[in-house]
Amino acid sequence: MFGAICAGRLVQTNLQQVADNQFVFQLDSAESLNHIVVFLLPNSPFPVGMGAKVYFQWPGKPFQFLGYLTNEKPSAIFRLKNTIQTLSENENCVGITAMLGISVEPLTNFTETPAVSTSASNVIAKPLPPVTSVAQKILTNLYNFLASFATSQLPPNSIGLGDLRPNDTFIPLRVFQDWHAKFLNKLSNNPNFLDSEDQI
C-alpha cells in the first residue's frame, strides 16, 4: 500500500504491518538521512474518508509527527536532517536504525495532530520561508549564473542599443534562457534545492 524512498537510496521494500491500520519501515543508518519521500502505491487508494499520518522515531524516543497522505495528496517529501538533535549527546550516532511509522486513520482525526508532536522535535515540519527569502535566493542564483558569462566585448555582428560606455558588460540573451531552463529543471527534480544552493 505504501512506498518510501530515502534520498540517495533505493526504494524501501521492508514495509511491515504491525496492526490493522499501522505500518512501519525500518531505516538503517538513519543518521545520514536528510529527506524521505513517502507515497501511496498505484492502484491502492485509501477508502473514502481515510488517510495516513506519517511519523518518524529514533531508538528509545517517541514517534514524531511528520505529516500526512490522502487520496488528494498521495505523496510527500519530509525533511529529516535536523531530527538527530532529539538524540542525547552521549548516544552513538553511527549505524542507527530508525522507524518510519504510518497510521491509517479517518480524515477527521487529522485536525487533532499538531505539525510537530513534541518540543524536542521542533525542526521536522519546516515552515515555508518568506517570499522575500525565496526571491533573494532566486535572484542570487540568477546573478551568479549570469555573471559567469558576462563579457566586456560586444559579440561580433551585434548592435548595441543606447549609449555604450567603455566599461559596460554584456550578457547574451541565450545565457538567460539557459539559466531559466536549468533552474526549472532543478526545481522539478528537487523543490528544495534553493535551501542548500551554493552553486550556479
Swiss-Prot record:
Gene Ontology cellular-component annotations: cytosol; nuclear envelope; nucleus
Pfam family, one: Hikeshi-like_N
Swiss-Prot/TrEMBL keywords: Cytoplasm, Nucleus
Places the protein is found: Cytoplasm; Nucleus envelope
One example of a Gene Ontology biological process annotation: protein import into nucleus
MF term (GO), any: nuclear import signal receptor activity
Entry annotated with the keyword Nucleus: yes
InterPro entries: Hikeshi-like_C, Hikeshi-like_N, OPI10
Superkingdom classification of source: Eukaryota
Cytoplasm among keywords: yes
Family in the record: Belongs to the OPI10 family.
PANTHER family, alphabetized: HIKESHI FAMILY MEMBER (PTHR12925), PROTEIN HIKESHI (PTHR12925:SF0)
UniProt protein name: Protein OPI10 homolog
The organism of origin for this protein: Schizosaccharomyces pombe (strain 972 / ATCC 24843)
